[in-house]
């Protein structure tokens, strides 16, 4: 379960002992100068992208075009050798030539010289990636950027929280927003770079801007990550329901977004993260994309294909198939409403027939809002007078 964000998570419990900057960051009182001691230096130009799937490859291409000395790390030496020889990822990103300045190697090579490490791996494999980072000579100034859009098992933790616990929250950022791989390398994307550290978020935004990719900055990594998890689940739900009508598909996606948002509020996420690029923007892009893995996975579920066979049918991992049951469990543990998200998890596991899923989507009514009684005009007038009087006294005391 994700912890509320009122305070910083504990500093590094990984390979490095927490230094002064990490300790100060955990207290919430660190000056920017102290934090910057553990961030990449100005002019840092080396990036490593871990994960050579469609998005990881596209990300590496964009970073290399933006002037960073970029290395793409494949999972196996055989895959790395094939990419290096063909200078194209024909399986996951066909038709996109790898820039000459982009190096390819296996994850066994480590990340000792990287200023930025981008983790383009599913949230279910994040623990494995963290272990490799610890073994790979991660530098003290290296920033770690997660591109996962799901929660980390077994407790449903946000990726940034898990990375922050291992390496220090001020060194961690995440990416969100609509960024389909093929389109990103040809026409750009709408990214969000989120971090607790303002300098890191600004630096990442500038890196992508130089590469021709629009990138917003955010100080709400948990909100951005939950928005991405909600998007994946909503896209899967819409795909599973679309054959029953667009209204049903819209209802399924809307219910899931609302359930995740109520939980996100309880852990301190900001509304802008859910309604902006990271949430609504990403959902619209995914819903419109016929090639979306999560949407296609939903369509295959509706066609009766078992969830275990879907990744092979699609040819890539589908993060939502594994993240939705964990997302539902996380919402339920927190005492939140998760009727539709939980039902989607049971549809994935085969416990809930499709027609029962559709019927539940069509008949579920979300909890009513808390109606607020409008104050009378007289009450408003007196409230205004009291506020003005109180404000005057407060201002006078502040000046003293």
Can you describe what each PLM-predicted range is?
Residues 53, 57, 77, 104-108, ...:
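Electropositive phosphate-/nucleotide-binding environments in soluble metabolic enzymes
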Residues 125, 136, 162-171, 188-273:
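Internal alpha-helical scaffold of NAD(P)-dependent oxidoreductase catalytic cores
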Residues 231, 235-239, 265-279, 283-400:
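NAD(P)-dependent Rossmann-like dehydrogenase/reductase catalytic/cofactor-binding core
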Residues 2-3, 7, 13, 28-96, ...:
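NAD(P)+-binding Rossmann beta1-loop-alpha1 motif at the extreme N-terminus of oxidoreductases
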Residues 146, 171-176, 215-219, 275-276, ...:
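General beta-strand structural signal in soluble alpha/beta enzymes
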Residues 98, 104, 109-188, 204-205:
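Rossmann-like NAD(P)(H) cofactor-binding subdomain of soluble oxidoreductases
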């Amino acid at each position: 379960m994700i912890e509320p964000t009122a305070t910083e998570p504990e500093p590094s419990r990984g390979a490095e002992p927490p230094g002064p900057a990490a300790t100060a960051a955990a207290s919430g009182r660190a000056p920017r100068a102290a934090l910057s001691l553990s961030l990449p230096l100005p002019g840092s130009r080396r990036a490593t992208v871990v994960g050579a799937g469609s998005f990881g490859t596209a990300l590496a291409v964009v970073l290399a075009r933006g002037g960073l000395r970029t290395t793409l790390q494949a999972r196996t030496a055989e895959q790395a050798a094939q990419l290096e020889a063909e200078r194209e990822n024909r399986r996951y990103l066909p038709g996109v030539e790898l820039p000459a300045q982009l190096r390819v190697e296996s994850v066994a090579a480590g990340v000792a010289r990287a200023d930025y490490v981008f983790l383009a791996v599913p949230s279910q494999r994040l623990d494995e990636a963290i272990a490799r980072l610890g073994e790979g000579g991660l530098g003290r100034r290296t920033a770690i950027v997660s591109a996962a859009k799901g929660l980390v098992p077994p407790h449903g933790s946000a990726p940034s929280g898990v990375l922050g616990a291992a390496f220090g929250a001020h060194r961690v950022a995440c990416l969100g927003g609509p960024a389909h791989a093929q389109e990103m390398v040809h026409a750009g994307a709408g990214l969000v770079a989120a971090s607790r550290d303002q300098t890191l978020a600004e630096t990442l935004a500038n890196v992508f801007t130089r590469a021709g990719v629009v990138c917003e900055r955010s100080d709400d990594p948990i909100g951005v990550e939950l928005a991405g998890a909600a998007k994946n689940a909503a896209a899967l739900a819409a795909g599973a329901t679309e054959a029953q009508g667009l209204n049903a598909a819209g209802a399924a996606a809307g219910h899931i977004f609302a359930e995740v948002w109520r939980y996100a509020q309880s852990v301190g996420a900001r509304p802008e993260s859910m309604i902006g690029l990271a949430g609504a923007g990403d959902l619209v892009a995914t819903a419109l994309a016929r090639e979306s893995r999560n949407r296609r996975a939903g369509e295959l579920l509706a066609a009766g294909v078992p969830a275990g066979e879907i990744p092979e049918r699609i040819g890539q991992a589908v993060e939502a198939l594994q993240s939705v049951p964990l997302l539902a469990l996380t919402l339920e543990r927190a005492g939140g409403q998760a009727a539709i998200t939980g039902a989607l998890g049971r549809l994935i596991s085969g416990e809930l027939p499709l027609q029962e899923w559709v019927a539940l989507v069509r008949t579920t009514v979300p909890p009513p809002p808390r109606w607020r009684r409008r104050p009378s005009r007289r009450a408003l007038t007196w409230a205004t007078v009291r506020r003005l009087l109180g404000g005057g006294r407060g201002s006078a005391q502040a000046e003293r």
